[in-house]
Structures are given as C-alpha cells and as structure tokens.
UniProtKB/Swiss-Prot annotation:
SUPFAM superfamilies: P-loop containing nucleoside triphosphate hydrolases. It is an enzyme of class 2 (transferase). It comes from Mycobacterium leprae (strain TN). The keyword Amino-acid biosynthesis applies. This is Shikimate kinase. It is found in: Cytoplasm.
Length: 199
C-alpha cells in the first residue's frame, strides 16, 4: 500500500486546501500528518514545540510520516518542516511527491498571519520565513517528483494539472530512482532545475 500522492511545501503553499481538493478528485481520503500528530499525542503542535522542543516534535513527526507512507493509500499532506528530517527524506524515495511551489511574498502573506505555526511565532516573522525558505526549498526540490506553481489563485487549475500529471505517471509506471528522471524527461526540463508552472 502506498499513497497516491504526497504533498510537500512551505507554510502557506496550500497543502491542506489542495490536499482536500485533490483527494476528493481522486476519490480517496486525505491524511494530514500535522493533524495525525495531534490526534496521536492528544496535544497541539504548538504545545509540543513549546514544552518538548523541535527535536522531539521531529522525532514524533518522522514516525507518523513513515507510518502514513506504509498504511495510507490516499493523499498525504506533510507538515512544512517534515523534510528537514533525513529519515523522512529517505522514506519518501520511490513515492510520488508533489512540491507545491510558492514565492516568498505570497507565502508570507498567507502564512505569517497564522498563530498556529510555532517556528514563525513572535516578531521578525518575515526574516524567519526567509530563513525557512533558504533551508527548506532545496530539500523540497530534492524529494519532489512533480513541482507545481501555486502562486496563482485558481486552485481548480492547480488540481487539474496535478491530476493530469498523476494520470500520465500511472500510464508510464517507473520505480525508485528512475522516477525523477522520467518526470524530467516528460516535462522536457533539466532534472530538478525547473518548475512545473500552472497559469
């Protein structure tokens, strides 16, 4: 058993919203790993960060992600920082991983007003967000098999594009390390160097 798709991206990229729409379009369920962590621990993510620290949160998160990749056959939406765990990145190998790309200005507009993102809490949120981008974007690109620009506000177009890419991938199944190469060849783009753009 494996997910139909795994969504990754920065806070504000639309993982939850697009995940719900994509899972509905595919006729499957959505598993949000942040929600799964809160259900498993009986605590909020903010509480885990505040009391136990980020390292403990990432340990819990890795376990939840690994279980989801084995047990869930729908769509899986990962927390924005999940890819900072080497174990998570390793576990994503061989899965269809969709990186929801977003520019800094739009991401900050969507995310920095949130009160439920522990790493963006307090003052200097814009600076903190820029730091998150610098550390995480290379990791998203590394694990992604499909990259989608979500800066446009037409979520329907984003979901339709993802559906088309998933259908193309299912029509030409590839395994493990060959998948990223196959994706790049079909898009006509250099491997991991260009974005799949939705207008």
């Amino acid at each position: 058993m494996a997910p139909k798709a795994v969504l990754v991206g920065l806070p504000g990229a639309g993982k939850s919203t697009i995940g719900r729409r994509l899972s509905k379009a595919l006729g499957v369920s959505l598993l949000d790993t942040d929600a799964a962590i809160e259900k498993q621990t009986g605590r909020s993510i903010a509480d885990i960060f505040a009391i136990d620290g980020e390292e403990e949160f990432r340990r819990i998160e890795e376990g939840v992600v690994r279980a989801a990749l084995v047990e869930h056959d729908g769509v899986v939406s990962l927390g924005g920082g999940a890819v900072t765990s080497p174990g998570v990145c390793a576990a994503l190998a061989g899965h269809i991983v969709i990186y929801l790309e977003i520019n800094a200005e739009e991401a900050m507009r969507r995310a920095c007003g949130s009160t439920v993102r522990p790493l963006l809490a307090g003052p200097d949120r814009a600076e903190k967000f820029q730091d998150l981008m610098a550390r995480r974007v290379p990791l998203y690109r590394r694990v992604a098999t499909i990259r989608v620009d979500t800066n446009c506000h037409n979520l329907g177009a984003v979901v339709r594009y993802i559906m088309a890419r998933l259908q193309a991938q299912l029509a030409t199944p590839v395994s493990g390390g060959d998948r990223k190469s196959s994706e790049a060849e079909r898009s006509g783009a250099p491997l991991r160097k260009s974005s799949e753009v939705v207008k």
